[in-house]
Structures are given as structure tokens and as C-alpha cells.
A protein has these predicted regions:
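Oxidative protein folding and maturation machinery
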Residues: 2-228, 232
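Short amphipathic alpha-helix with an adjacent loop that forms part of the alpha/beta core around
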Residues: 233-237
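Conserved redox-active cysteine motifs that mediate thiol-disulfide chemistry
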Residues: 238-239, 245-254
Length: 254
């Protein structure tokens, strides 16, 4: 259980480690997203104020405190960008639309600085924040939300390293799950913003894999036993109507 609470630290970093191990730092949770917008914002601000108060009371070295204040912001407000989506999910209120007050608050939390990409909390917060900000003023959900996110980045993010991180994250994730069909605009944006050799290599490997599954590409030949043990090959199916039933391994056929 709570054995970690009884640990005592020694040495030059004892005070810092004791602070980090107190467990008193609190953040927004998924459950908080069912709060109405104003109450949600107030709770987020209250948590952040309490976290800062605890940090200041610890009276730690300035260099650590300055970095920790930044980390605390993104740790505390981690769930903040998702409120519009999660509120609808939790309350079933499909009429909810985030207000300008919400977007103004979210915008105030966003700092675009590639030096912050060393912070896991920042790297997790930022994509969600950008995705949420790109929804401001959008009345109809686009066919591909990733294009909306990437276009927002292209227009608004001037820090090249931050733009690269975000575009790579969104485009790679989209093609990983949806393939190459209809992805020309995304690939164009990827090539515009992503220059890192490792990112490019990983992306090209992904595209090569999906190239085989593009619409119009001949299927690879195969031979598999049917439910009666008879071997069926792709060639045997030529000229026939094929019904494909896709189902999960843990359930019976639909």
C-alpha cells in the first residue's frame, strides 16, 4: 500500500526527492470532465494553485522550482483540453458546445516552445490542446479530423520543432490506423514539416507496409483451410461474390 510514504531520502537531492514523493500533487481526472464547464475550470485552477502552494512551501532550489512550475502546469491541466468531448460522453448532453471562455483559458495554457519537449507532461498535453483548439468555431465535424488538426498546426505553430513533433504524431497515427487511401494531403503536410531522419525512416517504413493495401492493388495470393478443412485459394474465389465477416476473437460470428 503506502510504503512509499515512509521512505526517507538523504544526500544533496533529499529535499527534492521528498517533495516528489509526498503524493500531495493533484491533477484533473477523467471523472472531473463531467463537471459543468465553469466548475471544471474552477477546479482545475484550484488544483494548480494548491500544487504551486505546495511547491513554494517546499522551498527548493530555484533551478528545480522553475522547471517544476512548468511541469506542474501540464500535469495538473492534463485532462483540460478533453473537457468538451468527455463532458458530452459522460453526461450524454450532445448539445454541449465549448464556450469562448473555455477556449481562452485553454489558449492561455499553451506555450509553444521546443525546449519543453523534454517534459513528458508537455508532450502529452500539447497534442490534445491543439486538437481541441482546432475545433473552435467548427460547426460540422470534418470527414478526417486529423486534416483539421494538421491544418491548424500549419497555420498557427511557428516553432519548427514543435510543429514537426505534432505533425509526425498526428499523421503517423492516422495512417497507422486508416492506411494511405485519401491521405495525400496529410502526407504532403508531413513532408513539409517533418525533417528528422528517424521520424522520416519510421514513416516511410509504415507507408511501404500500407502500400500493399491501397485500393486497386492486387491482393497477394493465399491458400487457407475452410471450416471443413478443405483448402481454399484466392484463385478459387475469382469471379464469385465474397462476403467477409470480420469479428473479434472473443465473440462468436455476428
Amino acid at each position: 500500500g503506502a510504503m512509499w510514504k515512509t521512505i526517507n531520502f538523504d544526500g544533496a537531492a533529499a529535499a527534492v526527492n521528498t517533495y516528489l514523493n509526498t503524493g500531495k500533487i493533484k491533477n484533473l481526472t477523467f471523472q472531473d470532465t463531467k463537471l459543468k464547464e465553469d466548475a471544471f475550470i474552477n477546479k482545475a485552477d484550484s488544483l494548480f494553485a494548491a500544487n504551486n502552494e505546495g511547491l513554494n512551501a517546499a522551498n527548493l532550489p530555484t533551478a528545480f522550482t522553475d522547471k517544476e512550475k512548468i511541469r506542474l502546469k501540464y500535469f495538473t491541466y492534463g485532462f483540460f483540453p478533453m473537457h468538451p468531448m468527455y463532458y458530452v460522453y459522460q453526461t450524454k448532453d450532445s448539445t454541449h458546445v465549448a464556450s469562448n471562455t473555455f477556449y481562452n483559458k485553454l489558449q492561455s495554457l499553451i506555450t509553444i516552445d521546443s525546449k519543453l519537449l523534454t517534459l513528458p507532461e508537455y508532450k502529452e498535453f500539447l497534442p490534445n490542446a491543439i486538437a481541441s483548439m482546432s475545433n473552435q468555431g467548427v460547426t460540422e465535424k470534418p470527414e478526417n479530423t486529423t486534416e483539421q488538426f494538421v491544418n491548424y498546426i500549419d497555420k498557427n505553430i511557428k516553432d519548427k520543432k514543435v510543429a514537426e513533433y505534432l505533425v509526425n504524431l498526428f499523421v503517423y497515427g492516422n495512417i497507422s490506423s486508416r492506411g494511405l487511401d485519401g491521405s495525400d494531403a496529410l502526407i504532403s503536410m508531413f513532408n513539409k514539416h517533418v525533417k528528422d531522419a528517424k521520424m522520416l525512416d519510421k514513416f516511410n517504413t509504415l507507408c511501404t507496409k500500407w502500400e500493399k493495401l491501397k485500393a486497386g492493388t492486387p491482393s497477394p495470393a493465399f491458400s487457407y483451410p475452410d471450416i471443413n478443412g478443405k483448402t481454399i485459394s484466392l484463385a478459387d474465389l475469382k469471379g464469385k461474390y465474397i462476403y467477409i465477416d470480420v469479428w473479434a476473437t472473443w465473440c462468436g460470428p455476428c
